[in-house]
Every structure is written in C-alpha cells, then in structure tokens.
UniProtKB/Swiss-Prot annotation:
Pfam families: CTP_transf_3
Function: Activates KDO (a required 8-carbon sugar) for incorporation into bacterial lipopolysaccharide in Gram-negative bacteria.
Reactions that this protein is recorded to catalyse: 3-deoxy-alpha-D-manno-oct-2-ulosonate + CTP = CMP-3-deoxy-beta-D-manno-octulosonate + diphosphate
Protein origin, superkingdom: Bacteria
Name recorded for this polypeptide: 3-deoxy-manno-octulosonate cytidylyltransferase
Organism: Bradyrhizobium sp. (strain BTAi1 / ATCC BAA-1182)
InterPro entries per the UniProt record, alphabetical: Cytidylyl_trans, KdsB, Nucleotide-diphossugar_trans
Subcellular compartments: Cytoplasm
Any one GO molecular-function label of the UniProt entry: 3-deoxy-manno-octulosonate cytidylyltransferase activity
GO (cellular component) term, any one: cytosol
Keyword Magnesium in record: no
The enzyme's E.C. designation: 2.7.7.38
Amino acid sequence: MTQPKILVLIPARMASTRLPGKPLLDIAGLPMIVQVLRRAQEANIGRVAVATDTKEIADAVIAHGGEAVMTRPDHPSGSDRIYEASCKLDPAGEAEIVVNLQGDFPTILPQNIRDVLLPLSDPAVDIATLAAQIHTAEEDAAPSVVKAVGSPIGERRLRALYFTRATAPHGDGPRYHHIGLYAYRRAALERFVSLPPSPLELQEKLEQLRALEAGMRIDIGIVDTVPRGVDTPPDLETARRLLSKA
C-alpha cells in the first residue's frame, strides 16, 4: 500500500505575554522554533515547515536550513494558520495528512510525532491526537491541563467523546492529559476551518470541540509522557537543562 504524503506544519508567532519573543529564545544554542523544527525533522515522516506571520521567525528558520512560509497575522487559531500554509506550500493538495505541531514543544520526542499518525490507519478517523495518563492530583485538578475523555477502542487507543479543563471523567479509572499535537486528513482540516466556532469550544476555549460538535471523529493515541511545553520562565529553564544534556 502506498504511504500517504504528509506535511508537518509548526505554527509560530510572537504573541506571548509571559515569554516575549518566545519562538526565538535560545535553547541549547538554537532558537526554540528551530529546536521544534529539528524534532519534526528527526521524526522523518514528511516535509516540515514553519508557518508564521513574523519575518524574524521565518528568517531564523531559513538561516538554520529550514523551510518557512509567511501567513496572515489575523488568524484566530493555529489550525487556520496551518490551513493557509498548507494551501501555499501544497496548492495541488498532494499531501493527504497535515500534522499540526505546536511551536513551543522543543523537547517533544520524534517518536510521539510518528505516534500521532497511527489512528489515521482507520479510514473512519478524521483527526488524530495524543494523550498520556494522569498520575498526580495536581495535574488532575489543574484547569491548564486539558483532559481527554474517550471510549477505549483498542490497546492504547481512545475514541474522543469530549475534551475539558475540568476533572473528568468522574469516579475510579484512568484520566488522560491531552497533548496538543494533531494529524488531520486534508479534507478534515479544510472542513474544520470552514466551521464557525461552536458553543462548547467557546465555553471551554478548546478548538477541538468544534470538530466533535460537528460530528467529526477524533481518535486518541495513548503515549507514556507529556512533552514539556514552554510557557513560563521556569519552563524555559527546564527545556534548556534537558536539551543541554542531549
């Protein structure tokens, strides 16, 4: 069977209040966005590019041998940005799968980027994402930790039913920390960005709920660990420490 063509896109912009200029902050000798680019390249699943509205970010990526595409500054979400980027980079629509990798995941494992493709082996799945089991009460209670609620459909696989910032589901049993890494079928991404924001999306401030409310199927692959995002100065120091040892 022919392997599908895959386009990995990393949306990046400067609008961080807690870490100004976040994509260009140095981590182990490279701008953070270039560290994320390296992890995507190491996954070796397809073409990789950074989608940005900021010339300084594009220049940094290109200076380190990467590919960047400029997008409009007024996109409401990363998904809209990667859709515009996919249309510019692949106007013929040859890429069947588009991966959305957050630009603040410099320590993500390349294997996790490969893992997010696995649920799409089922043709009924529109969008694939990842989650890891929650092991601490602090993580369980934190609204900043998005919980993935799903029905088990196989070993280390869930069919997504809901995503929430609340502690859910109630009662005994595992709960899962959602990881913001997505693999879209090209047609699913096009449909997703054409939809208006949905009521639950606006209430929870979670754009993936737009897809669920529209009847799209999201499957979740279970992985062992959550990649460390960089949102605060302590996060930045942790990433620097981890990658300085790599």
